[in-house]
Amino acid sequence: KQDEKFFGHYSLFGDDSLDKNLKKFGFVKEDITDVFLTHLHFDHCGGAIEWNDDQSGYRPTFKNAQFWTNENHWKWATEPNPREKASFLKENILPMQESGQLNFLPTPTTGNYGFAPDLKMDVIFVDGHTEKQMLPVLQYQEKTIVFAADLIPTAGHIPQVYVMGYDT
């Protein structure tokens, strides 16, 4: 959907693809029923939308899926501030709504939102990397897994405990 210059800066390396990776596990794109969008920056939601067959417009990549975000973040993405405007590309966002596949999670003023209790999944809403980013919290095999996305993109972004010591 973007031009050659864009992909000169932001493109995948190698011959891996979504279709190949889904096939490895016995799935195709039509099997996907839900897409949880941590936030709507192009590098997190761009793959959710693709060209239609004659490249005259766009369509959801996952035609049988519901797309999940929250209304506060949607408003932030569709009416962006100057700093984030380049990260919210309308061609990656608006087709979700136009297709009728977009859903908004309620945004609680305190605490988490129980998104899928049967999957043991909650959602934490944070302001930091972007307004009302959603972090999925999963309970799995007696462990808690939080996908922090760009809020904490690498282990290097977590401050280390440091106790100063020296000899006198």
Q: Which ranges hold each PLM region?
A:
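Short acidic/His/Gly/Ser-rich catalytic and metal-binding motifs that mark active-site loops
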Residues: 1-2, 76-78, 155-159
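Metallo-beta-lactamase
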Residues: 10-27, 31-43, 61-125
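Conserved P-loop NTPase mechanochemical-coupling segment
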Residues: 2-9
